[in-house]
Amino acid sequence: LKVKHEGGVVIQGASGLLIRIAKCCNPVPGDDIVGYITKGRGVAIHRQDCMNLKAQENYEQRLLDVEWEENNSTKEYTAHIDIYGLNRSGLLNDVLQVLSNTTKNISTVNAQPTKDMKFANIHVSFGIANLSMLTTVVDKIKSVPEVYSVKRTNG
């Protein structure tokens, strides 16, 4: 018996559980996920490679098999990326233009130059439907001139 829960997650044979998406790794549909039974706060959904999860004592004993609900395109999940590029006029604008054309909602933007002022570090959080959409956004930002790296972060 598969039971759908809020958050777009399906858990084998369990209903009435409080489900939440873990903030430490922010999984999105398409990520390999696992449920972690917390003490008093229901089940936290983590990416399988979450270092925070693996740091928990005896964590394997508290894991549940979970999967993403199919055809779950209406939910929005938060993704975080770090962008590193040349600190040039218009870089932030170019990055935000890509995001506004490809995502539903930008949550946070933090841009800072390096100490020598030559490069910029930009952290952005935004709403995303799934992993393939996130990959598309990352690929488009990588094509912005003078962007040297784009990587997904946990928050």
Please provide the spans of the model-predicted regions.
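A cross-taxa feature marking solvent-exposed loop/turn segments within ectodomains of secreted
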Residues: 104, 117-119
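N-terminal non-catalytic structural scaffold regions of very large proteins
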Residues: 1-92, 111-112, 117, 125, ...
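Acidic active-site catalytic centers that drive phospho-/nucleotidyl reactions
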Residues: 108
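A common structural junction motif
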Residues: 61, 101-105, 142-149
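Short alpha-helical elements within RNA-binding folds
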Residues: 95-103, 112
